[in-house]
Amino acid sequence: MNFAGFDRQQWFLAHRITAVFQVKQASRKANAEDWRARALARAKQATADLTQQGLLLALGFGERAWLPSADWQMYQQTNTAHLIAISGLHIGLAMGLGFMLVRLLQVFFPTRWIHPPLAQYGGLLMAGLYASLAGFSIPTARALLALSLLLAGQLGRRHYSPLQWLSLVVVGLALADPLIVLSSSFWLSAGAVLGLLLWYRYVPLSLLQFNGKPLWGVWRHLFGLLHLQIGLLIFFTPLQCYFFHGLAANGFVANLLAVPFYSFLLVPLVLFAVLSDGALWSWQVADGLAEFISRLLHLLNGSWLNLSIIQSLLLTAVLALFFGLLLCWIYSAKRMPPLLSVKSKGLSLSSQRSLPVNYRRELQWGITSLIVLCLSIAGWQHSQAANWRLMMFDVGQGLAMGLFKENRGLLFDTGGSWANGSMAQTEILPYLQRQGITIEQVILSHDDNDHAGGINAIFEAFPFAQFISPSYKAYTKVATTQRQLCQQGQRWQWLTADFSVLWPPQAVSRAKNADSCVVLVRLGDFQILLTGDADLSAEAAFSHAVPKLDVLQVGHHGSKTASSEQLIKQAQPKTALISSGRFNPWHFPHQTVLDRLSLHQADIYNSGWSGAVQVDFSDKMTVTLARDPLSPWFSSIIGLSAK
């Protein structure tokens, strides 16, 4: 558990995942397939030779297993991933499609058979059918329940304002599924709807007129789409920055092109192909359309911007200010010149526009409060960055330490890696991006995977950082000119911090535990010792040079092969940081080490229990834990018990 990035505990609980295991061997005992599995199998066979099979199956069944990771990343980085994941948008489209089909069929019915609710029931039935194709995943079930609540209210002749309807739906969903509040997709959906309700309340499409008349026909649809996307740009961007830590510069254009294409062409065609078993070459036509829009989005790819917390807050304040100025411009004068005109004819604002006094007060209070709040938090964040900060990341059974000041940083080890990822990608880089930190130096204690596994990911993100290592081992993303050897006696200064290397005496071809780079860091009056996995023999050689310490990074994850009595007695550390994985097979940290540290009155913090540990240095030293008494309740339960 770290201070930024993906919260696995929250995600597991929101998706009802109570255990994680690895299947080593499996065999099929029976073919107990339901109709969805059979439909998916037929669709897989029918689309086997199509270039966009992964996208078509994702749209038809909510299955992204066959979608290439590069395509999924493209949709994420163009702000259009919501078009692939079957959720409220798709279920709403299915309901609208079912409604229109029933209304069309009612043309052929006798008058006595035509009942207004029949089309609504047809829409709900189509929405339920689409949700079942998606396996009634949590987002689809949530959307279906929300539509059912709205339909029940309409049939019960309940008359509420749009905001009241939204409140009732949110409360109804929370009562039906209390854990829904842990789902980020729920808040994204609710936030998007709330933003659009506010947008249409204060800037309705009816404000626009063409040639002095309300918009109608194709003009109304075209400007309606543009109007919708502008509203989402203003209101949804802050939510996106909060949940995804960035945005796509071309996202507005991408959605402006892709949303109507998916809504009116691709999704209905894929639904028809699934339900008709690919009749009328529907799969082939859908593949051609999917190929076209994918190529179009590919041209817009590459504009993703990672934003820090401060940048996100400032952007939110700017958007709030823009919205306020837009409203002032719209409602400040009774008559204004046309926006787009040719010979006094064109697009203009309605002269009948007005903003009620109560709306005006709501806006003034809301916009001002939001701007002040964003600027205050941004100012506080900026002031905190001026102090030295030491971070022990929670990277499981590995080590990754960071030293930061004024948005500049140094890393000591990078955590482990596996076949298609690393702790650097999932835990370290998200934190650095959210804090707006640039890494200038990377010190590698030794070459074991649990310490060096993320080195290539770090240098891919920060290619100009200096690399300091006790070995000559080459790493793919590290240039030879960036390397500096870590050897006993070296000294250097970075910003106002002084670094002294206590071990090893010489570099080796591949550094192991005993060759760990041991660094003493002086931050004014504070002393920090970073030991990596240095063992007892190494400690015996350098411990005499260790001063009294404020912070000790306990060697080898708390193993009894390190942290000797000689070192602990010499250093007398006030704070001891242990990086270990919970329930690791070696049972680190060892009780002998814990007892030794306690005997010398050190405050002990283990990342396996406390999550990431943050130490701030100002006039005094302050320790903050990612998992503390103020953390959400599930952070203290999920994954913390061996039973």
Model-derived regions: residue spans:
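Conserved beta-strand hairpin/beta-sheet module of binuclear metal-dependent hydrolase folds
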Residues: P268-L271, A385-P430, R434-Q435, K512-G532
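Active-site HxH/HxHxD metal-binding segment of metal-dependent hydrolases
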Residues: I443, D447-Q487, P573
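Active-site-proximal loop/helix segments of hydrolase catalytic cores
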Residues: A424-Q425, S445, N449, G453-I458, ...
